A protein has these predicted regions:
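Structural motif corresponding to the intra-repeat A-B loop/turn of tetratricopeptide repeats
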Residues: 32-33, 66, 86, 106
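Residue at a conserved register position within TPR or TPR-like alpha-solenoid repeats
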Residues: 29-30, 63, 83, 103
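Alpha-helical linker/edge segments of TPR/alpha-solenoid repeat scaffolds
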Residues: 2, 71-74, 98-110
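Structural marker of alpha-solenoid helical repeat scaffolds
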Residues: 15, 48-49, 65, 82-86
Length: 110
């Protein structure tokens, strides 16, 4: 029997529940089928692996989609702060663009 991607990730998680990449992959995989579980894994990353910069964009976007606007704004801001501290300017730029769009500040030239 072949394991599904989710089953494989859950096995990896059992082997090493502190691995940030596995937690991130689980959050992403659950996003397709169970946003509540996805949110739990993103929140785990935010709490236990605050320097895992990739989390912030997706977690903030999920909060926004769930109507949790205040939480989305906090996560975008924290992500920009962390990515700048880490010197990850690519992530900072992506977060800043997403934040500006979220805030309605993504002006287009007409």
């Amino acid at each position: 029997m072949t394991l599904t991607r989710l089953e494989q990730l859950l096995e990896f998680y059992k082997e090493d529940p502190s691995d940030a990449y596995t937690i991130y992959a689980l959050a992403t995989e659950y996003l397709k089928i169970d946003t509540r579980k996805s949110k739990e894994y993103y929140e785990m990353l935010l709490a236990e692996h605050p320097n895992y910069v990739g989390t912030y964009y997706h977690a903030a976007k999920l909060y926004d989609e769930l109507g949790q606007k205040d939480e989305a704004e906090k996560v975008y801001k924290k992500g920009m702060q962390i990515s700048r501290q880490e010197g990850n300017m690519h992530a900072f730029s992506e977060l800043q663009q997403a934040y500006n769009k979220f805030m309605g500040l993504d002006y287009e030239d007409e």
